[in-house]
A protein has these predicted regions:
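ATP-binding/phosphotransfer module of carbohydrate and carboxylate kinases, centering on a glycine-rich
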Residues: 1-4, 26, 47-54, 98-196
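Short beta-strand-loop/turn "lid" adjacent to the catalytic site in phosphate-handling enzymes
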Residues: 1-35, 48
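Small-residue-enriched, tightly packed secondary-structure blocks
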Residues: 7, 40-45, 58-64
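Short strand-loop junctions, especially beta-strand C-caps/beta-turns
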Residues: 10-12, 79, 195
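Short, acidic loop-to-helix structural element flanking the phosphoryl-transfer center
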Residues: 16-19, 60, 177-180
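Active-site phosphate/pyrophosphate- and oxyanion-stabilizing loops and adjacent acidic/basic residues
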Residues: 23, 42, 115
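Conserved phosphate-binding catalytic cores of ATP/NTP-utilizing and phosphoryl-transfer enzymes
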Residues: 31-55, 72
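Glycine-rich phosphate-binding loop of actin/hexokinase-like ATP-binding domains
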Residues: 51-108
Length: 196
């Protein structure tokens, strides 16, 4: 007999509301005995096995969750692309496209990102990317995939893209340090897990 269910879903930062639980868990019987948590909490529990530590999630979005010695969580980031998940693959792709546009308009550095995007999307120049990225099917996960495709094509040989990636790493590191400090997690060695 199952006494309690725990279900995780994206976009939930704390314990879910009754409405969220009913909407997302209504088919699980009995849903009143179901705990609905954010996907980062589930990821944290899987990575740390419930012990104090840090989970850095950096994929389509970016978030950091820290569990301290008192089993209290600090969660930073994870606000989604409209509110700028700094350091995420989505963020990297947008920065790369912006760098290509700046290159095209002669307002930024020369970069192989421009020709790479033209080759990947079989477009004459970077202006051709506009209808593609504004198409409803070009979702944020496709931006994230684009970051990986650019990285693979450039093979670490483009200074502008390397700078974007270094900036992404710096932003994620700053977010992680801030989360650890806010959580008052002062243990050594500090268990840090990465996902994404």
């Amino acid at each position: 007999e199952i006494i309690h269910y725990t279900v995780s879903a994206a976009g939930i930062f704390n314990e879910a509301t009754v409405d969220q639980k009913e909407k997302l868990c209504g088919k699980i019987y009995p849903w009143k005995q179901t705990r609905l948590v954010g996907d980062s909490v589930a990821g944290y529990q899987a990575a740390t096995l419930g012990k104090p530590g840090v989970l850095v999630i950096c994929g389509t979005g970016t978030s950091v969750i820290v569990g301290n010695l008192e089993s209290k969580f600090t969660h930073l980031g994870g606000w989604g692309p409209l509110l700028e998940d700094k350091g995420s693959a989505y963020w990297i792709a947008v920065k790369a496209i912006r760098a290509a546009i700046d290159n095209f308009e002669n307002t930024g550095e020369e970069t192989a990102i421009t020709s790479t995007l033209c080759e990947l999307y079989e477009i004459k120049n970077i202006q051709g990317i506009v209808p593609l990225i504004y198409h409803p099917e070009f979702t944020r996960d496709k931006f994230a995939i684009l970051a990986a495709r650019i990285d693979k094509a450039l093979e670490g040989k483009d200074k502008v893209f390397q700078n974007i990636c270094e900036e992404a790493g710096t932003e994620v590191a700053k977010l992680t340090i801030t989360a650890v400090e806010k959580a008052n997690l002062d243990i050594s060695p500090l268990p840090i897990f990465f996902s994404g």
